[in-house]
Amino acid sequence: MLVPSDMIAAQSKMVYQMNKYCADRVQVRKAQIHKQIQEVCRIVQDVLKEVEVQEPRFISSLNDYNGRFQGLEVISPTEFEIIIYLNQMGVLNFVDDGTLPGCAVLKLSDGRKRSMSLWVEFITASGYLSARKIRSRFQTLVAQACDKCAYRDIVKMIADTTEVKLRIRERIIVQITPAFKCAGLWPRSASHWPLPGIPWPHPNIVAEVKTEGFNMLSKECIALQGKNSAMEGDAWVLSFTDAENRLLQGASRRRCLSILKTLRDRHLDLPGNPVTSYHLKTLLLYECEKHPREMEWEENCIADRINGIFLQLISCLQCRRCPHYFLPNMDLFKGKSPGALENAAKQVWRLTRIMLTNVRCLEEL
């Protein structure tokens, strides 16, 4: 098929604009975040070292692997989450019956005594390992460690939350989340994935992702708030971060995500935080299903993919629903105010209109 020369010229201009935007904006953002990460991890490692002295069951898993820290997630340039992996889930069964959207529980295996578990005092009378009880104990230990550590003048615990959150130099927020890694397991609530008839991802990658498994996090679950569920405090939040990152390898998918995050930080950091980098990552995964071929993710297609993701974001904001990629019954907009979502839809449309109508738009964005 012959492609009109003016279309090729427009594509070439957009590729040039994208490359320039990556050099001028995306790389600067990455460099700033990298600098923050070095300080954040140095301070948190010191705090966790103190925690481990008080309670050897909470062993720090925050280690540097060739410049990347295991368990570190960048929420925004000033907000980070660090996952601390706990040991010995052994005598506990993973229970995922769908009654707790986005969550599951860990229950003592039939016939096993509480005393066989490393976490004996956090197991409820019904035999569930309570995520809230573990987090409460961890929060107390971290608070004590902050008072003793070498960085006590610049790191403070954030009060009025059941989460373990630190404020560093009054401007950086770090959440430290206890978790269990569930390798070789795949939750029943995500068993529909991948959808039949969709060629992406490749079956080999699907097998790899399911073997890698998922994480169970001890954190507040917005999906359960207001349900008065007796299980709410005991439930663990399902996290698929490693699976998501594996799926986004190859072609220009990661680059596309970096551009989306940069545009979000510069233009969609709005009151009420209606649009997060995780929303964009989720919609990017859906876009990968719509455009399964590798050639659709080459650099001359990135602008089209970004516009497609923003149009999908507008639709989600207007419908006030953004389904989780692996757990579509879970709404990622739950807890966001209708006013914040409506305002965000207008802002995203303004941004998308600029990108659709001005080939040199990235010079100004």
Curated annotation (Swiss-Prot):
It comes from the Eukaryota. GO terms for cellular component: cytoplasm; nucleus. Pfam families: Mab-21, Mab-21_C. GO terms for biological process: eye development. PANTHER family: CELL FATE DETERMINING PROTEIN MAB21-RELATED, PROTEIN MAB-21-RELATED. Belongs to the mab-21 family. This is Protein mab-21.
